[in-house]
Regions:
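Active-site and adjacent substrate-binding regions of carbohydrate-active enzymes
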Residues: 86-88, 308, 321-325, 375-456, ...
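Terminal connector regions
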Residues: 214-247
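Short solvent-exposed strand-capping/beta-turn motif centered on an Asx-Ser/Thr pair
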Residues: 89-94, 279, 594-598, 609
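Flexible loop/turn segments at secondary-structure boundaries
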Residues: 215-220, 256-264, 292-298, 337-342, ...
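Aromatic-lined carbohydrate-binding/catalytic grooves of carbohydrate-active enzymes
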Residues: 243-382, 393-395
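Polysaccharide-binding surfaces and accessory modules of carbohydrate-active proteins
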Residues: 1-181, 185, 192-196, 615-627
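Short Pro-Gly-centered flexible turn/kink motifs
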Residues: 198-217, 642-650
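Active-site-proximal substrate-binding groove within the catalytic cores of carbohydrate-active enzymes
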Residues: 208, 402, 428-627, 635-648
Length: 653
């Protein structure tokens, strides 16, 4: 799409810490009992054009004879955006003095009537994905609760002031902190690693979170769509250099009656693929989740990273080769950071494990693999890389199903607070970077009991195909989740599960997908829960709805997003949204009437519609109409029975 960035947007760069000089950098830290701001002379400044739209300034200086500070500031020329990251390195032969309270950004965002718009992220409960708007009239602290980056506080938030706003994102796959408080002239913001108070050992480097700011003139909706455009341009990973297209996923869940994927065999995977192909359903992704390794049908028994030869005597290669021959990408699940007793890693390398004692005095059954140990990280890189290559894996999926916070805290020294966490984060990112570099075309799916670790540093390398473990088939909960994802992390996946009962309430029993379940799962990627041996009628429905989904998903990735309703997680509401490409004058809107909605008529008032006449086509292609722009803007009404949905595609006639 053509740029919508204006001179008014770019004039706001000075409000988001545009680079001026080393001593005016917004970094703050305390070292040896003294507080410092910026980088003091003497220092070196290097300016590098990363591409036509990005310039990076690297500022290096010495704090004393042993501690070096390097700050990287990136400015974007195609958006009013800045980015900050810093590294501290001990260049000496002895431990440094104490370094603490490091804040990569600590400064003032000028503006009147500031308000903070923020969320609680993925809590792994139904109360997750909530949003709040608070006037900045007292100090507020945002920080996740368990050592993952999105549980209890979402690392994407916004400050709105009079006539403009700033989108802010924290890139730290662990415990970050952001403090926002009122100050003369605006809002003071301070962002860093939540726990950082340590000496650095000789040769050691510690880094800060990476923080991004994107400023915009106008209202929140404009700020949201500028963020989406920036994300698609600069963050979303590409597939072989091309934008990631919609992905349709299939699998054999609970194969052989065993939980998750503990029952997969070479035979049932290949026959499952053939069943779908013979029915006319060709997936983009063939999904193998937890349980393909030796685990005695207990998938959390993790730590032996090799295929279970009892079920997969020739490894994963026959399945991967089958996928390659059919033009399908094989996705494979890993959880490398968790280790259980009795597994290969626990027996061979106990020195790589961080253990913790629970509050009741017993040992946690989960040990944390210390990716901050370079030898450990190298071993995991080599082992997983070999599985990827041997298995023809095209999508690497990583999960993380427990909290690491206490594992770090219980194993750190008094003068090394936050060090294990910091080194682990560095190892985690190095691990992913190595896998991607070694396997051209590989892309990554990020998961942590759903969406607990989807900070921006992670999202530079991955997409969240599984953004939550909550509410797959509870449609109002899913609508609330999608509302946040479309705004901040706009490539994600949904299931077409349905858990609703005949009376419109929701339980946990999953029912066969129907048309409504497909409409409730409109997202850039879809996992179709239609079974590989489903009857012809179910396969026919899947084929029909897949085409509607794919057309809509393409527009989601090529248009601005406009929510047309509030989203309250209520089965009594309408849910509606619009995606619009202003360059082509085309898009679609969807209206969904939830299971207990007493209203029958919804009036859709479309956004961003230029003057002219528009041709509208129903998703199923059975209905068409021609409508002028004035009517679309003022509202066009549709009658829907409860538990139904419509999609209308439109284009300028």
């Amino acid at each position: 799409m053509k740029s919508i960035v204006t001179s008014a947007d770019m004039a706001l760069m000075n409000r988001i810490f545009r680079y001026d000089s080393p001593e005016k950098l917004p970094i703050y830290y305390e070292y040896g009992g003294h507080a410092y701001r910026g980088v003091q002379e003497p220092c070196r400044v290097c300016r590098e054009a990363l591409d036509a739209n990005m310039v990076r300034y690297t500022v290096c200086g010495r704090i004393d004879e042993s501690l070096e500070l390097r700050v990287e500031i990136t400015e974007y020329g195609d958006f009013a955006a800045t980015e900050f990251l810093a590294f501290f390195t001990n260049c000496g032969n002895a431990e440094t003095k104490r370094l603490r309270n490091v804040r990569i950004v600590d400064g003032l965002i000028e503006g009147e009537d500031a308000a903070l718009i923020h969320g609680n992220g993925d809590t792994c409960r139904e109360d997750g994905y909530e949003w709040f708007r608070d006037a900045v009239d007292e100090k507020m602290t945002l920080t996740p609760v368990d050592g993952t980056s999105c549980n209890g506080a979402f690392p994407y938030f916004r400050i709105m002031a009079k006539n403009f706003g700033v989108n802010i994102a924290v890139g730290w796959p662990a415990a970050w902190i952001a403090e926002i408080e009122p100050a003369t002239g605006g809002a003071h913001i301070s962002i860093g690693q939540a726990r950082f108070d340590m000496v650095l050992r000789p040769g050691e480097t510690m880094r800060t979170p990476r923080v991004n700011f994107l400023a915009f003139a106008g209202d929140e909706t404009r700020g949201m769509n500028l963020w989406r455009r920036w994300y698609f341009s600069h963050i979303l990973p590409r597939e072989n250099g091309k934008p990631l297209p919609p992905k349709y996923c299939l699998h054999t869940f609970n194969a052989g009656g065993h939980p998750e994927f503990t029952g997969i065999t070479t035979e049932n995977q290949i026959s499952g693929i053939d069943d779908y192909l013979n029915a006319g359903l060709r997936p983009d992704i063939w999904w193998i989740d937890a349980g393909w390794y030796p685990c005695d049908y207990d998938w959390p028994k993790i730590g032996t990273w090799k295929p279970d030869t009892a079920r997969l005597p020739n490894g994963l290669a026959p399945i991967g080769e089958k996928c390659d021959s059919e033009g399908i990408q094989l996705l494979l699940w890993f959880e490398p950071e968790r280790v259980r007793e009795g597994t290969e890693l626990a027996i061979a390398h106990p020195e790589w494990l961080l253990r913790r004692t629970k509050a009741d005095g017993t040992r946690d059954e989960n040990s944390l693999l210390n990716l901050g140990d370079r030898a450990c990280c190298d071993w995991v890189i080599d082992r997983v890389d070999s599985i990827i290559k041997e298995g023809h894996v095209r999508v690497y999926r990583q999960d993380f199903n427990f909290s690491p916070r206490e594992h770090w805290i219980q194993n750190e020294a008094e003068n090394r607070i936050g060090a294990l966490e910091n080194l682990h984060v560095q190892g985690y990112l190095r691990y992913w970077d190595a896998l991607i570099a070694r396997n051209p075309g590989l892309w990554v799916d990020s998961c942590a009991s759903g969406g607990r670790r989807n900070d921006l540093e992670t999202m530079r390398r991955a997409v969240p195909l599984h953004y939550t473990d909550v509410g797959y088939g509870n449609h109002p909960i899913k609508q609330k989740q999608h509302r946040e994802m479309f705004e901040w992390i706009p490539y994600f996946r949904a299931h077409n599960m349905r858990w609703d009962n005949p009376d419109g309430s929701y339980g946990r029993e999953n029912h066969t997908p129907d048309e409504f379940a497909y409409y409730a799962a409109m997202a850039p990627s879809l996992t179709d829960m239609t079974e590989h041996d489903a009857p012809k009628e179910a396969m026919a429905l899947a084929i029909r709805m897949r085409e509607i989904w794919r057309k809509a998903a393409g527009r989601m990735l090529d248009g601005d997003y406009y929510p047309l309703t509030e989203c309250r997680k209520s089965n009594e509401d309408f849910y509606a949204m619009q995606f619009h490409n202003p360059d082509t004058g085309s898009g679609f809107f969807q209206i969904l009437s939830n299971t207990c909605n007493r209203k029958r008529v919804f009036t859709a008032k479309l956004r961003a519609i230029d003057d002219g006449v528009y041709a509208l086509t129903a998703g199923d292609g059975k209905s068409r109409m021609v409508v002028d722009a004035k009517r679309l803007r003022e509202g066009i009404s549709f009658e829907l029975p409860r538990r139904s949905s419509v999609i209308w595609f439109y284009e300028k006639a």
